Amino acid sequence: MKASQCCCCLSHLLASVLLLLLLPELSGPLAVLLQAAEAAPGLGPPDPRPRTLPPLPPGPTPAQQPGRGLAEAAGPRGSEGGNGSNPVAGLETDDHGGKAGEGSVGGGLAVSPNPGDKPMTQRALTVLMVVSGAVLVYFVVRTVRMRRRNRKTRRYGVLDTNIENMELTPLEQDDEDDDNTLFDANHPRR
């Protein structure tokens, strides 16, 4: 196995692992963008007025009523929630009782669209840790490979020509007018 192929393969492996680790991170925003594109009414200019959701009425939410399916509980998705956020999903996790409190009426707007989404700082920390781990693995593999190469060099004496271990002595020449000086490498002691 050649060293250039190993480094190339190692860098490709690290890049693919990093990409696979980042795909779940990127799938959340990508899914939100795709949902927003599907919910968009047309290709015309965006509506200049801000999109707001109407306040929820007090009482049990549609998701808490027994006998209703998930599709019915989510409500219509056309003009109401163009950004793909669903305030009902946030209320399901907050209020498991039979009655919605006063704080749960406006609380749906502060909940992220997908509770599985991580904040930006946590994503950045995850990416930083993955890159640090990849660099650590690279240096460990490189150190192990260098030790193996040094062991083989010591065992077989291949390419073991360190300048400290050499003693340079001039060769005897018949021609004295030649300016080229040749040296012989003698290893002193081993």
UniProtKB/Swiss-Prot annotation:
Keywords: Glycoprotein, Membrane, Signal, Transmembrane, Transmembrane helix. It holds the Pfam family DUF1180. The keyword Transmembrane helix applies. The chain crosses the membrane at residues 124-144. InterPro entries: FAM174-like. Glycans are attached at residue 83. GO terms for cellular component: membrane. Residues 172-181 have a biased composition (Acidic residues). It is a single-pass type I membrane protein. Residues 42-117, 168-190 are annotated as: Disordered. The keyword Signal applies. It comes from the Eukaryota. Residues 1-29 form the signal peptide. PANTHER family: EXPRESSED PROTEIN, MEMBRANE PROTEIN FAM174A. This is Membrane protein FAM174A.
